[in-house]
């Protein structure tokens, strides 16, 4: 395993990229109409409180909580806790537990431990630019799902005590599942690619979200850490 594989995994937590079985109940037209309404509401709200879980096969699981804004670029701060997996102990040693990920319009910044900083010239924060091809915000994911050829309604389910309608469709190499409440608000989103799964629960739409930019002298680029630069 590469020396910094656990660092790569931890830094990926903030990307916010399982699913359950089901077959199409209704046509794509009805599904797309509901998803368009949900996307309009997400865009209008501009922010929300989030509770996200990430699973990377058997290697690592984590939970991230906080608030994110997408009204003018992505901004917000998440507290990240490692919850299990084969790399849990070593990830905690390098990344700290809890750690923190800050989202700013240009990139996400992940706080690492003093042990990590000793290996990186005293720098604690990893700066990772966004993949512009990815689904960075809930509105992006809903847009991708609206455009999916196989988008469909799976059925009705309960999400943390709220009755919701479940929709699913393919996106790139994986698929997206979303759950909308009775008012067509997004309450849960799951994205699955290979053995990488992220599930995000949303509440408190319109909640304040902010992030402070780490000092440049305390920041190292992701490409430098992984040797990709």
Where are these predicted regions, by residue range?
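N-terminal leader/targeting segments and the immediate start of mature chains
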Residues: 2-73, 212, 218-229
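Short, hydrophobic/aromatic-rich segments at coil-to-beta transitions
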Residues: 44-51, 73-77, 88, 160-168, ...
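Extracytoplasmic
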Residues: 45-47, 71-75, 96, 103, ...
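Beta-turn initiation residues at beta-strand->coil junctions
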Residues: 52-56, 79-83, 111-114, 190-194, ...
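Amphipathic hydrophobic-ligand
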Residues: 59-65, 93-96, 195
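An acidic-aromatic
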Residues: 70-136, 197-199
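Solvent-exposed helix/loop surface patches that form functional interfaces
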Residues: 120-159, 215-217, 228
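Gly/Pro-enriched, hydrophobic low-complexity segments
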Residues: 162-218
